[in-house]
């Protein structure tokens, strides 16, 4: 398999795997353009399909972690017909090579406790590749690290991510444009919340400083109810109604 690096120069003519076209693709591409100057790297397969990796120096990552000197993987996604061919290893190897070449201490990424969860890395794959859990949030989301040097300080969650909570009653949703699916589903969830008079506060994160202080380990999509973290899984309008106890 051959891979393409998406850059500011070619992004307008290349697809980005998780969103092939339309408004979702445009929102994601604008978000990527914003971060290219901060060291974001995006590799994808030459073939059409979901096979890509996206990473950035951890100091510039839109997550509340303390990981100076590391790379942070926003997303490593290989699915459908692309699975089972070693492409995840190829993409991860490219990240490791970049980390070594730039003198990074290691690589970090989020995964779930014990099993694969939607929009998080597979913990079994990470363990197989040598990643270790270095911190755990109260909601069962782990910070995993592959170290490339010895005796270095390991990445940790900030307190706001380690103990996720909000003060508001009802539903509270934090999200960024890092995942194009939020562009499609968040407006639909807002519509049904208004239609059924469901208390919902939506916070669109537009800058790094805000993202690094979100009260959750995940910023792409973090849904709370009555102060408690519910899920990082992007909800459709029907799934959201089900969470609210409404069967449409």
Positions of predicted regions on the chain:
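Non-catalytic, surface beta->alpha helical segment in thiol-disulfide oxidoreductase systems
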Residues: 226-248
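C-terminal "cap" of GNAT-fold acetyltransferases
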Residues: 138-163
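Conserved beta-strand in the GNAT
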Residues: 44, 48-59, 72, 77
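Conserved active-site alpha-helix within GNAT-family acetyltransferase domains
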Residues: 113-138
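Short amphipathic alpha-helix that is part of the acyltransferase structural core
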Residues: 1-48, 160, 181, 188-192
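Conserved acetyl-CoA-binding loop-helix of GNAT-fold acetyltransferases
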Residues: 78, 84-100
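Conserved GNAT acetyl-CoA-binding A-motif
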Residues: 97-118
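Local sequence-structure signature of Cys/Sec-based thiol-disulfide redox active-site neighborhoods
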Residues: 160-195
């Amino acid at each position: 398999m051959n891979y393409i690096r998406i850059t500011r120069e070619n992004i307008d003519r290349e697809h980005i795997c998780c969103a092939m076209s339309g408004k979702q693709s445009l929102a994601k591409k604008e978000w990527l353009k914003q971060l290219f100057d901060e060291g974001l790297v995006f590799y994808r397969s030459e073939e059409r399909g979901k096979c890509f990796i996206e990473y950035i120096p951890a100091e510039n990552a839109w997550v509340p972690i303390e990981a100076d000197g590391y790379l942070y993987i926003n997303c490593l996604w290989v699915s459908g017909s692309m699975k089972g061919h070693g492409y995840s290893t190829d993409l991860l190897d490219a990240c490791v090579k970049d980390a070594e070449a730039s003198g990074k201490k290691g690589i970090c990424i989020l995964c779930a406790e014990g099993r694969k969860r939607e929009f998080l890395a597979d913990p079994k794959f990470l363990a197989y590749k040598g990643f270790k859990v270095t911190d755990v949030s109260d909601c069962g989301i782990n910070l995993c690290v592959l170290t490339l040097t010895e005796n270095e300080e390991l990445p940790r969650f900030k307190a706001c991510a380690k103990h996720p909570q909000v003060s508001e009653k009802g539903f509270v949703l934090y999200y960024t444009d890092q995942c194009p699916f939020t562009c499609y589903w968040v407006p639909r969830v807002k519509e049904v919340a208004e239609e059924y008079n469901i208390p919902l506060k939506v916070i669109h994160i537009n800058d790094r400083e805000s993202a690094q202080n979100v009260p959750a380990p995940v910023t792409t999509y973090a849904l709370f109810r009555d102060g408690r973290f519910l899920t990082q899984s992007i909800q459709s309008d029907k799934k959201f109604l089900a969470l609210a106890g409404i069967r449409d």
